[in-house]
Amino acid sequence: MVSFTTLLAGFVAVTGVLSAPTETVEVVDVEKRQTIGPGTGFNNGYYYSYWNDGHSGVTYTNGAGGSFSVNWANSGNFVGGKGWNPGSSSRVINFSGSYNPNGNSYLSVYGWSKNPLIEYYIVENFGTYNPSTGTTKLGEVTSDGSVYDIYRTQRVNQPSIIGTATFYQYWSVRRNHAPAARSRLRTTSNAWRNLGLTLGTLDYQIIAVEGYFSSGNANINVS
């Protein structure tokens, strides 16, 4: 995550890993709270996705409803979170909780569309690395009083939800970090469309915590 290329390779790889929950961390109410290995699926009414690059030091836990937690220490690259599948361009996503990164990390709305194949991010908070570094700003949008800067990048022959492909990535990066916020997908998607950045049919859409060789903890609730 020192660069877009390194970061996004970790993000994209989420889509290629499938496994089932492996172990509960509580004897009581195990259906509502589970520590899991890498994988995707549904938990307590929400879609989840969790991937890591094989390094130890990351614990991802699905909680009740839309809640999840991540604890990481001297980890490699990972990304995990909860949301919906399919996504919606008109959804209003509320999230709250605590997010305490020490180093490179992001808290974002993350998802994909097909036809066209697009990978997109609405970055609400980040640690020491701003994902807009080294890119050209296309515009900005204001949502609920916060300003987001808009960028587009391209990935060539990289993993995606349909296999190896070449595709664009859309980015909206919030200027003021938010530990809790409301993300209005319609506002963002309209701003992207006005800049010629169109989305296709939406695939999964989650609030994701990502880290790259860093430490920290997060307890997030999505609704």
From Swiss-Prot:
Primary enzyme class: hydrolase
EC number: 3.2.1.8
Signal peptide feature range: 1-19
Glycosylation sites: 94
Main localisation: secreted
Pfam family, one: Glyco_hydro_11
Gene3D superfamilies documented for this protein: 2.60.120.180
Keyword Nucleotide-binding: no
Residue ranges constituting the GH11 domain according to the UniProt record: 34-223
Pathway where this protein functions: Glycan degradation; xylan degradation
Gene Ontology terms describing biological process: xylan catabolic process
InterPro entries noted in UniProt: ConA-like_dom_sf, GH11/12, GH11_AS_1, GH11_AS_2, GH11_dom, Glyco_hydro_11
Location of the protein in the cell: Secreted
GO MF terms held by the record: endo-1,4-beta-xylanase activity
Keywords: Carbohydrate metabolism, Glycoprotein, Glycosidase, Hydrolase, Polysaccharide degradation, Secreted, Signal, Xylan degradation
UniProt KW Coiled coil keyword: no
Active-site residues from the entry: 119, 210
Top-level lineage group: Eukaryota
Catalytic activity, as annotated: Endohydrolysis of (1->4)-beta-D-xylosidic linkages in xylans
Function of the molecule: Endo-1,4-beta-xylanase involved in the hydrolysis of xylan, a major structural heterogeneous polysaccharide found in plant biomass representing the second most abundant polysaccharide in the biosphere, after cellulose. Acts as an elicitor of plant defense responses in hosts such as tobacco (Nicotiana tabacum) or tomato (Solanum lycopersicum). Induces the production of ethylene and leads alterations in membrane function with rapid efflux of potassium, uptake of calcium, alkalization of the medium, increased leakage of cellular components and necrosis in plant hosts.
Subunit record text: Interactc with tomato LeEix2 receptor to trigger its internalization.
Family statement: Belongs to the glycosyl hydrolase 11 (cellulase G) family.
Protein name: Ethylene-inducing xylanase
Native species: Hypocrea rufa
